[in-house]
Swiss-Prot record:
The gene is purH. This is Bifunctional purine biosynthesis protein PurH. Residues 1-144 form the MGS-like domain. The IMP cyclohydrolase activity resides in the N-terminal region. Belongs to the PurH family. Transmembrane segments: none annotated. GO terms for molecular function: IMP cyclohydrolase activity; phosphoribosylaminoimidazolecarboxamide formyltransferase activity. Keywords: Hydrolase, Multifunctional enzyme, Purine biosynthesis, Transferase. Pathway: Purine metabolism; IMP biosynthesis via de novo pathway; 5-formamido-1-(5-phospho-D-ribosyl)imidazole-4-carboxamide from 5-amino-1-(5-phospho-D-ribosyl)imidazole-4-carboxamide (10-formyl THF route): step 1/1; Purine metabolism; IMP biosynthesis via de novo pathway; IMP from 5-formamido-1-(5-phospho-D-ribosyl)imidazole-4-carboxamide: step 1/1.
Amino acid sequence: MKRALISVSDKNGIVPFAEKLVELGVEIISTGGTKAAFEQAGVPVTGIEDVTEFPEMLDGRVKTLHPAIHGGLLARRDTAEHMEAIAAHDIKPIDLVVVNLYPFQETIQKSGVTLEEAIENIDIGGPSMLRSAAKNYAAVTVVVDTADYDTVLTELEEHGATTFETRQRLAAKVFRHTAAYDALIAEYLTNITGETFPEKVTLTYNRKQVLRYGENPHQDAAFYTEPGTVENSISSAKQLHGKELSYNNIRDADAALKIASEFTEPVAVAVKHMNPCGVGVGENIEEAYLKAYEADETSIFGGIVALNKEVDAKTAEHMSKIFLEIIIAPSFSEEAFAILAKKKNIRLLTVPFAGSVKGFEKTSVNGGLLIQASDSVIEDTASYEVVTEKQPTEAEMKALIAQWKIVKHVKSNAIVVGSDKQTLGIGAGQMNRIGSALIALEQAGEKAKGAVLASDAFFPMDDTVEAAAKAGITAIIQPGGSIKDKESIEMANKYGISMVLTHVRHFKH
């Protein structure tokens, strides 16, 4: 290895890396700020303009886009015609390229960033050099990640060159990196143009964790996250205690966070297998947790609990009495953390809460991807329609709205029975609505008397209304829209219960 081209925006570790290259007899070529950093550190360096014999221009937009650079990168060392061609133009081969790109992602995440600022942080020369070097990985080593500096230096010290396998691996990493970089730029500009569903979609995610296994032990799995910070997201969670999250932990935690984010008042949400098993609302977080626990003392065991307020010592004492896989909250008091951390297997996570989840959801299908807007429609309760002779009381309406927030997160067909303070029965995932209703009502038992019922979609028949009325339900909330709405309304009137239509469906598959 004789010549290296180094141009980086992230200068961590680059000076000692270059110093070692010089010790190994490698000539360093560099540009702009990187060249200045080398000169300041006393590292011998050749300026890019001395290689191209052409000055930087257009405020630095054109520096390395030159045959003297790309010819030195792309020439095949095993092809005589290539080597003769570059020699004829006095172009020398470049054996190592170390480049990382303008910080486009960091720029667009800044508050108040302008389009002009974003555009100026789109790197052109950097990706071009990386791609040229990566294409010719048979002869050229290309580094885009500071984590690979040591590997390259070790191989150079031991063998005088990098191995083919290392060059191939680094080239693959470069093409992943430039593809992700371009995807971020495309997404940013697409959002500005207002195109919701463009003809092509390229998604970029960063690997956060290789998981022990997936949904089952025979399935390999990893966790990838979107670039940047996503509030209310398990991807942005900070783990304070406990072993690594599993695949199922992550999915359950995501489900719990989505429900907890629906509420501004203190709420505790217990989840098993991506369905809530208990949700409690209170004047404080302790009361909320106790309500969630009382909602289903059996199912909460081994579950995931998300709370939207800081966990205090009293709440922690209650939670420490049972086995919980994960507790998620905005924060834990020092006393609460000390209490819960005594249980070595529990995972404690903090997540920034900021209202209900918005944006788009992506679901893979065999051979494709479904993308839809998140079910975060802002509903105006003033547009809800009372269609029965009996009007819901103020207390019933409060309970109906609370359970309506919850039922949208239960797998369809979904029925939730509850009060303004807690769920009392949850029927999830049945193939017919009456089946889910009977499960929810049976779970609620005697507590169904005086409670309310929420349904994620309309009643195809009046049997659910009749079953609810016979169990003691006093008010129902549902979207409406069935050709048999009239029959359901008449059944409600027959038993003297109120019914509210939201005109919004919340299927969840």
